Regions:
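Alpha-helix C-capping/helix-to-loop hinge sites
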Residues: 60-64, 82, 113
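Secretory/endomembrane lumenal or extracellular ectodomains immediately following the signal peptide
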Residues: 1-71, 118
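Short, intrinsically disordered, charge-balanced linker/junction segments flanking boundaries
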Residues: 113-119
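Conserved alpha-helical segments that form or flank metal/cofactor-binding pockets of metalloenzymes
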Residues: 71-108
Length: 119
């Protein structure tokens, strides 16, 4: 699934960030997170208006959707795997899949499993 991009079309922002951008990036990360904001977030932050509009959309999808969190994550994992989006797949496995109780076998099935495999 690995695809390395050495020259992205839109490069993510690197620290130090402008104060407004820093505030947006901190809202996207878990409270007290020590890690650098995700590359996806730093790329969205290149366009501050887009960045400010994406948080409510993401929050709505992840926090207020009609699909149960476990099923949502299975769909996201499978979609990321099929699209070769290894980075995003890994983020969702660690941040959501494991905490929601998906087993290693279920997570592996999102990459290597057939459509009819139970997850």
């Amino acid at each position: 699934m690995s695809q390395t991009v050495t020259n992205p079309r839109i490069a993510p922002l690197e620290p130090p960030y402008e104060p407004e951008i820093d505030a947006i990036l901190k809202k996207w990360m878990p409270p007290g997170a020590e890690a650098e904001p995700l590359r996806l977030f730093r790329t969205l932050a290149v366009h501050d208006e887009l960045a400010s509009r994406m948080r409510p959309i993401g929050s709505g999808i992840l926090g207020h959707g009609r699909v149960e969190a476990r099923e949502r994550e299975i769909v996201i994992h499978r979609t990321c795997a099929r699209a070769g989006a290894e980075y995003e797949w890994g983020v969702h496995v660690l941040a959501f899949g494991k905490p929601l109780g998906l087993s290693d076998e279920q997570i592996a099935a999102t990459v290597h499993g057939a459509a009819e495999d139970p997850v």
